[in-house]
């Protein structure tokens, strides 16, 4: 699709808004947990939201649209993960220092100017995702940039804000939200207008920005923890905002399909939601500038030079240097190095390869390929496995107590029985490594069958020894025995 369209001739303009949850102990304005582990609500409250005029006397068009939909909002409350602050029954507490530190580090990594005083603002949102009818947000960085293909990509601003409640269902004007996501610290990174780039290049730019944020090792991972909003226009046409692209790999397709929609339809300024297949659906009119006003319950926060200097001293290794180090020191391919850089297992990967005598490519492939495949194809709940179990797994590999082919089966076992160890998996699955002599003994009767081909003999032998010896070694043994 991309080859058939000249995006430069269309004057494609794109603006990115990347939202990344921070992995802090507490929420942004209270001491509730951010882990979202609770499944059963302890109560449900019901609200109706109404728009109010800004200090200039105007009502935001998007807020008015949501109000006219006349919906009722039902909020699920969870123990230790929701409190009076989320219910809008209590003023916000002091801004979370851990979240501010991390957000400022991200802004510094993006070469932003940091204001010497920051102010929490209220942004009107009455779609029900905020019980208060507004989202608290604070600008903590401006005028930053990253480099891409020799060009400077403008980062207009970085904001620290509270995440919205997660929608559970909507039917007949009744909307149900979970309150445990509301208030989790979230960093929003906004780019300047990207013009002269293809959808694939814009996706690469989004990836680079995401890597910068995740290099702090203080960001959450998994579905819903990072979301992209994208603003798109062509040929001086109206701007369309598309919200909620949850998979980075879908971003280029969303842009391509939106360009085609704008070419084939008469469009107007509006906000649309991204679907899982890359198409979009109408949400509401595009919001205006009348929905921002000061948060009166939180005083301005002074950002001193000493504070910023201390943060600069503890900035993580730049991702570009880490990428080159992974490729040169660990001999990872460019693709594998980039994948592990963006993985939630990055820190664990570095810990293992720095302390174990195992091949880094095997460790990286386990975390970015094997685990993904098991989660996608077999719905294995890998998140049930602790870091210590993974470390134990590679201890066994280092000591040659298992072969790399056994890793997928062991991971499946550990996910099913997280209380058990790798040793238990070996016994239960009968994955004790075989010697070449033992394989020859198993293969003897098979290769001696009349008219059997190498491919068939190899397949039969592998079915009997899979996970107990390297596949290349089996191939070598069978070839030798069939000469």
Each predicted region: which residue ranges?
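Conserved mixed alpha/beta catalytic, RNA-binding, or beta-rich assembly cores of soluble enzyme
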Residues: 39-40, 210, 354, 365-375, ...
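Strongly charged, low-complexity linkers/loops
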Residues: 382-391, 404-466
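Residue-level detector of well-ordered alpha-helical segments, enriched
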Residues: 336, 348, 358-367, 389, ...
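M16/insulysin-pitrilysin zinc metalloprotease superfamily fold
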Residues: 363, 374-384, 392, 396-397
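Core structural elements
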Residues: 224-236, 327-351, 361-377, 414-417
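Basic, nucleic-acid-interacting segments
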Residues: 1-317, 328-334, 355-358
